[in-house]
From Swiss-Prot:
UniProt catalytic activity: RNA(n) + a ribonucleoside 5'-triphosphate = RNA(n+1) + diphosphate
Protein encoded by which gene: rpoC
Amino acids binding Mg(2+): 460, 462, 464
GO cellular component terms, A-Z: DNA-directed RNA polymerase complex
InterPro entries: DNA-dir_RpoC_beta_prime, DNA-dir_RpoC_beta_prime_bact, RNA_pol_asu, RNA_pol_N, RNA_pol_Rpb1_1, RNA_pol_Rpb1_3, RNA_pol_Rpb1_3_sf, RNA_pol_Rpb1_4
Protein name from the UniProt record: DNA-directed RNA polymerase subunit beta'
Keywords linked to the UniProt accession: DNA-directed RNA polymerase, Magnesium, Metal-binding, Nucleotidyltransferase, Transcription, Transferase, Zinc
Originating organism: Klebsiella pneumoniae subsp. pneumoniae (strain ATCC 700721 / MGH 78578)
Length: 1407
């Protein structure tokens, strides 16, 4: 019996390991794995079906074909276990050893491993410092390579052609050694002295200055060091022994009809063995060189094909012209080992069916068809039946269940009670795509789903299917109940708002119920309470919408958390009073005393969750749903054609628009406007007409005229069904109603340009043939878009998950003082996102002070929940520094304080939460709602882009930041700085609006002045950029020579003449080096200095500048000296939607990025070249100036002599994130990426918390480049994991040594995934071959820190419930408690078991 227990223990024993290492296998190692050499290409005997001896399926090498039976049948049964049959040489053991025993092939000549040869950069090439072409020519027997030059003038590694080799032979005889083929390369690799080579290269590195050479040397040093440290020998990259896969992993299966289905590997192995044997024979016969050579080349090709078919030359194909699947193909790609079998497995105990509505279910229930339940819970039912003694054996139980006896159903009821099941709907885009429910048995064959969880699943009932999974073990059931139950997932992890929100019918019902109506039946009653309201409604004495007074009792929490009752008479309606009955204690009545739309209901549930917690919210949500359904039914809302009321004004508006269009057409024909202008104007006219029609239509639908109690007419909100559906947010929108009852409007062609004849009809009137045809473009494009979008969005999610999968909360507080400063998001005159939404659920990084005082309002390290946010708002705090994931100091993972609130739970996040995956899902899940479009700016949009003034919307005071200005002659301020921002501050000191003010803008109001709403505060000319003088004096032209550097132009319309500076390309030879400038002198002709500097005021003029002043004119500060025409941006496309998000996360450089100042200093221009100007920035402190060549066509934002700060924009354009990181630091680039991504999502109305984007940014900033190594082991210019540098520097500094200096790198998500420390994770993502090659050469260890690696090796993941398990393992490992594995091999134990069983089954005589 003891043996039996030992056996069961041995069965469950897992290999205890902490890391996985990959390395090159030496020939001896391969031989040690092998159980024998495969000598023949034969597989099995076609008559006896027995494996051939020494063949690819040989039983002697790989083990017996039948359990405990040798091949010839001499030894059978268990008692001969371990015997090796002397006749056939087969060991008597279990047949499963054929899955693990390997063989080998001794190659007759060495062969290069194609991965190390062809996987770029070629490892062999890098190690020998030879081009890949040369190595290939040697390997495939086209050239010789010199192995030892001896005393001759031939160098090592030199390539010789056939002729050169023969000449050298004649000349030097056998003083030198040159060979061809893999043996030559092997010899070269064997002769390398790695350590000495390393020393030599390091010396070279210190001496060289050329950038390219340094890069190349660093690469080689890294590779050489990897070889030295890992203990790999270079010559192992050349195979002399080839391992053979165990036969059961490349099976040969007989089909009916005497044919065989075989794995492609067998074909490839056969090829290798055939060629190898032929080569051996040729060598024995001492065949001519050329024949042997050809055979060797063929062997090399066969081995290449086996390892990675198609990597070099044409892929070898099988009988059906299909390329054979090699070993490399087995592991890579979607169908490879990693993604098909290790990361995605099939699930036992699951079923799927169509879903249908379960409106009577509670939130934690789902309806499960009896048939399904019986099948899924079979094992539990069998167990219960046996336990009760109703069935003696499992077989009997099975029969009972098949007969579906009555008792079985009773037992099924018991088994199912409180046993949660998981429901999953594909595609599972975020974690709410799998939730747990308690099953309720139902008749029929469809699964019933609770309507409120549809939003999380994105499910509807038009034929969607869902899968049911049964958690079997107790732990699984516990996790399902505690973590995955639908009632525990009320808030969305993406934004912390309720996701269990009523929609459609329910919203309509609640909206209808809470609307009020003028002069409804029963208006003006005074009722004793909600109960009475319900009674009089049921009795038909009052309408649901009647305005009445009701006595309402509200409960408020006092400071001790006790409920205090407060009764008062409220003006409300009958419906709202009835709804109040289901609202839980503790919420104010005002929450239902309004017409409830979708937003209001969501807010109501949110408030309920925050004040009362989970349980009341769940009950409340269910109650709202039942009530909503009931009253939606009573409302009788329907859609009829007469509900789509077409406004009378429509035809008038359209005829006006047609007249305008005709007028423009006339202007065009008489040549007053260009074709482009005409097109844009026409589009504008129709867009405006469309807006007017839809406004008229909405006004018409929105209100109806009724007679009130006094007999007067009164306007009230309409009860039109279509309008109610749109207004409540149940279904439809103003835009859709516009198409039904207004006009369809402008349509786009397939290429995205707008057709200038709009569809003036709507769907109620019906479309004519042409209009219908035009409409088809959009419809078809919509379908094509959706299909593309799904794939793209899925791929984005996959990359995001891959880059962030190993980010887990690993400690409570890292203690950092860093953080990011949060301000409200303000675009122009609107607050897009208030501060409260941005800081809610974050932890403060420093004390927040009361504005204008030194009092602490919120102490450091406080989690800002709703109450704190109210406090911040009450004190009108404008910016808060909060902790952020990006600045978290934890080495592996992040700390809870830097992350803040767990959005889906509402408290500080727990340790072990997989925030990386949550972030990836939150960003990826709404991906399918984003557009795929590139927006063309045309028509209305392009003219709105050229703004020329700032008009404020609210009243308040003006605040200018980083502004330099001068006062002009009329006493107005003129801005002379580049990135000036104008903010409007309200009386509480909060920022309400924010605008960019360009250079040269004239301010109507100064800093700190009060303005009223609607006032214009700044003006400028959008088409030219002025040059503004900061001093007063007289103009003096320098180098302004007519015909050489300038030319005079006269305007035909005004007759004014002006000077235009010639571009250097247009100048004569004499004018090339002249630099036209305007100098300002005083009355005596002395230079005037720019205030605050010792520089004379002179303004250099770039090409095309227009000067409207004459030499010697008097000017005063703030005047415009010259104007530089701005080419308007034209119609640039803005990339929007998904492609934009992908670009941001991939950190792609934009096409023509903005040029930023690399250092702070004074601008000047050096000598120009043909197409470029030389920009020089001279630092004020007198250090080295910085020079940059800028193409002429780039428009510069700076003038000579102007001062710029590091990171300022020198030339406009989209900013490249890498530049922002380099010049302005980590926080700036985080802010840039977060804001840009949020802009895209905000446009679609999707809310995502900033945290999630920051998490991804942290992963993009994972690497750092070493700038100087200090006392560390890093190489200069090497890219290393940021955490590794941090740890190394910490250790060095602790020992008083100099740490390494480094700069952070920004990698795109794909590159960041591939550059992860874990090679298992990287290999399962993309470019499997390259990743594994690199890892093997470097002898990498995978510490199994991330989630993916642990899934692949089949362990619990180090997150969630697995986090505790891993922590415990590490603790016990450290304490040395983990026991050594039991010393019983599985075979032995299983044999013992079998013996015991035999003994028990009458096998022994002495009982």
């Amino acid at each position: 019996m003891k043996d039996l227990l030992k056996f069961l223990k041995a069965q469950t024993k897992t290999e205890e390991f902490d890391a996985i290492k990959i390395a090159l296998a030496s020939p001896d190692m391969i031989r040690s794995w092998s159980f024998g050499e495969v000598k023949k290409p034969e597989t099995i005997n076609y008559r006896t079906f027995k494996p051939e001896r020494d063949g690819l399926f040989c039983a002697r090498i790989f083990g017996p074909v039948k359990d405990y039976e040798c091949l010839c049948g001499k030894y059978k049964r268990l008692k001969h276990r371990g015997v090796i049959c002397e006749k056939c040489g087969v060991e008597v053991t279990q047949t499963k050893v054929r899955r693990e025993r390997m063989g080998h092939i001794e190659l007759a000549c060495p062969t290069a491993h194609i991965w190390f040869l062809k996987s770029l950069p070629s490892r062999i090439g890098l190690l020998l410092d030879m081009p890949l072409r040369d190595i290939e020519r040697v390997l495939y027997f086209e050239s010789y390579v010199v192995i030892e030059g001896g005393m001759t003038n031939l160098e090592r590694n030199q390539i010789l052609t056939e002729e050169q080799y023969l000449d050298a032979l004649e000349e030097f005889g056998d003083e030198f050694d040159a060979k061809m083929g893999a043996e030559a390369i092997q010899a070269l690799l064997r002769n390398m002295d790695l350590e000495q080579e390393c020393e030599q290269l390091r010396e070279e590195l210190n001496e060289t200055n050329s950038e390219t050479k340094r890069k190349k040397l660093t690469k080689r040093i890294k590779l050489l060091e990897a070889f030295v440290q890992s203990g790999n020998k270079p010559e192992w990259m050349i195979l002399t022994v080839l391992p053979v896969l165990p036969p059961d992993l490349r099976p040969l299966v007989p089909l009916d009809g005497g044919r065989f289905a075989t794995s492609d590997l067998n074909d490839l192995y056969r090829r290798v063995i055939n060629r190898n044997n032929r080569l051996k024979r040729l060598l024995d016969l001492a065949a001519p060189d050329i024949i042997v050579r050809n055979e060797k080349r063929m062997l090399q090709e066969a081995v290449d094909a086996l390892l990675d078919n198609g990597r070099r030359g044409r892929a070898i194909t099988g009988s059906n012209k299909r390329p054979l699947k090699s070993l490399a193909d087995m592991i890579k790609g979607k169908q490879g080992r990693f993604r098909q079998n290790l990361l995605g497995k099939r699930v036992d105990y699951s079923g799927r069916s169509v879903i249908t509505v379960g409106p009577y279910l509670r939130l934690h229930q789902c309806g499960l068809p009896k048939k399904m339940a019986l099948e899924l819970f079979k094992p539990f039912i069998y167990g219960k039946l046996e336990l009760r003694g109703l069935a003696t054996t499992i077989k009997a139980a099975k029969k009972m269940v098949e007969r579906e006896e009555a008792v079985v159903w009773d037992i099924l009821d018991e088994v199912i009670r409180e046993h949660p099941v998981l429901l999953n709907r594909a595609p599972t885009l975020h974690r709410l795509g799998i939730q747990a429910f308690e099953p309720v048995l139902i008749e029929g064959k469809a699964i019933q789903l609770h309507p409120l969880v549809c939003a999380a699943y994105n499910a509807d009932f038009d034929g969607d299917q869902m899968a049911v999974h049964v958690p079997l073990t107790l732990e699984a059931q516990l996790e399902a109940r505690a973590l995955m139950m639908s009632t525990n997932n009320i808030l969305s992890p993406a934004n912390g708002e309720p996701i269990i929100v009523p929609s459609q019918d329910v919203v309509l019902g609640l909206y209808y119920m809470t609307r009020d109506s003028v002069n409804a039946k029963g208006e003006g009653m005074v009722l004793t309470g909600p109960k009475e309201a319900e009674r009089i409604y049921r009795a038909g004495l009052a309408s649901l919408h009647a305005r009445v007074k009701v006595r309402i009792t509200e409960y408020e929490k006092d400071d001790n958390g006790e409920f205090v009752a407060k009764t008062s008479l409220k003006d409300t309606t009958v419906g709202r009073a009835i709804l109040w009955m289901i609202v839980p204690k503790g919420l104010p009545f005002s929450i239902v005393n309004q017409a409830l739309g979708k937003k209001a209901i969501s807010k109501m549930l949110n408030t309920c969750y925050r004040i009362l917690g989970l349980k009341p919210t769940v009950i409340f949500a269910d109650q709202t749903m039942y009530t909503g359904f009931a009253y939606a039914a009573r409302s009788g809302a329907s859609v009829g054609i007469d509900d789509m009321v077409i406004p009378e004004k429509k035809y008038e508006i359209i005829s006006e628009a047609e007249a305008e269009v005709a007028e423009i057409q006339e202007q065009f024909q008489s040549g007053l406007v260009t074709a482009g202008e005409r097109y844009n104007k026409v589009i504008d006219i129709w867009a405006a007409a469309n807006d007017r029609v839809s406004k008229a239509m909405m006004d018409n639908l929105q209100t109806e005229t009724v007679i009130n109690r006094d007999g007067q007419e009164e306007q009230q909100v309409s009860f039109n069904s279509i309008y109610m559906m749109a207004d409540s947010g149940a279904r439809g929108s103003a835009a859709q109603i516009r198409q039904l009852a207004g006009m369809r409007g402008l349509m786009a062609k397939p290429d995205g340009s707008i057709i200038e004849t709009p569809i003036t009809a709507n769907f109620r009137e019906g479309l004519n043939v042409l209009q219908y045809f035009i409409s088809t473009h959009g419809a078809r494009k919509g379908l094509a878009d959706t299909a593309l979008k799904t794939a793209n969005s899925g791929y984005l999610t996959r990359r995001l998950v891959d880059v962030a999968q190993d980010l887990v909360v690993t400690e409570d507080d890292c203690g950092t003082l860093e953080g990011i400063t949060m301000t409200p998001v303000i675009e122009g005159g609107d607050v897009k996102e208030p501060l409260r939404d941005r800081v809610l659920g974050r932890v403060t990084a420093e004390d927040v002070l009361k504005p204008g005082t030194a009092d602490i309002l919120v102490p450091r390290n406080t989690l800002l929940h709703e109450h704190w946010c109210d406090l911040l708002e009450a004190n009108s705090v404008d910016s808060v520094k909060v902790r952020s994931v990006v600045s978290c100091d934890t080495d592996f993972g992040v700390c809870a304080h830097c992350y803040g609130r767990d959005l889906a739970r509402g408290h500080l996040i727990n340790k072990g939460e997989a925030i990386g995956v949550i972030a990836a899902q939150s960003i990826g899940e709404p991906g399918t709602q984003l557009t795929m479009r590139t927006f063309h700016i045309g028509g209305a949009a392009s003219r709105a882009a050229a703004e020329s003034s700032i008009q404020v919307k609210n009243k308040g005071s003006i605040k200018l930041s980083n502004a330099k200005s001068v006062v002009n002659s009329s006493g107005k301020l003129v801005i002379t700085s580049r990135n000036t921002e104008l903010k409007l501050i309200d009386e509480f000191g909060r920022t309400k609006e924010s605008y960019k003010v360009p250079y040269g803008a004239v301010m109507a109001k100064g800093d700190g002045e009060q303005v009223a709403g609607g006032e214009t505060v700044a003006n400028w000319d959008p088409h030219t950029m002025p040059v503004i003088t900061e001093v007063s004096g007289f103009i003096r032209f320098t180098d302004m020579i007519d015909g050489q550097t300038i030319t005079r132009q006269t305007d035909e319309l005004t007759g004014l003449s002006s000077l235009v500076v010639l571009d250097s390309a247009e100048r004569t030879a004499g004018g090339k080096d002249l630099r036209p400038a305007l100098k300002i002198v005083d009355a005596q002709g002395n230079d005037v200095l720019i205030p605050g500097t010792d520089m004379p005021a002179q303004y250099f003029l770039p090409g095309k500048a227009i000067v409207q002043l004459e030499d010697g004119v008097q000017i005063s500060s703030g005047d415009t000296l010259a104007r530089i025409p701005q080419e308007s941006g034209g119609t640039k496309d803005i990339t929007g939607g998904l492609p934009r998000v992908a670009d941001l996360f991939e950190a792609r450089r934009p096409k023509e990025p903005a040029i930023l100042a690399e250092i702070s200093g004074i601008i000047s221009f050096g000598k120009e070249t043909k197409g470029k100007r030389r920009l020089v920035i001279t630092p004020v402190d007198g250090s080295e100036p910085y020079e940059e060549m800028i193409p002429k066509w780039r428009q510069l934002n700076v003038f000579e002599g102007e001062r710029v700060e590091r990171g300022d924009v020198v030339s406009d354009g989209p900013e490249a994130p890498h530049d922002i990181l380099r010049l302005r630091g980590v926080h700036a680039v985080t802010r840039y990426i977060v804001n840009e991504v949020q802009d895209v999502y905000r446009l679609q109305g999707v809310k995502i918390n900033d945290k999630h984007i920051e998490v991804i940014v942290r992963q993009m900033l994972r690497k750092a480049t070493i700038e100087s190594a200090g006392s560390s082991d890093f190489l200069e210019g090497e890219q290393v994991e940021y955490s590794r540098v941090k740890i190394a520097n910490r250790e060095l500094e602790a020992n008083g040594k100099v740490g390494a200096t480094f700069s952070r790198d920004l990698l795109g998500i794909t590159k960041a995934s591939l550059a992860t420390e874990s090679f298992i994770s990287a290999a399962s993502f993309q470019e499997t071959t390259r990743v594994l090659t690199e890892a093997a050469v470097a002898g990498k260890r995978d510490e199994l820190r991330g989630l993916k690696e642990n899934v692949i090796v089949g362990r619990l993941i180090p997150a969630g419930t697995g986090y505790a398990y891993h922590q415990d393992r590490m603790r016990r490992r450290a304490a040395g408690e983990l026991p050594a594995a039991p010393q019983v091999s599985v075979e032995e134990a299983s044999a013992n078991l079998a013996e015991l069983l035999n003994a028990g089954l009458g096998g022994s005589d002495n009982d």
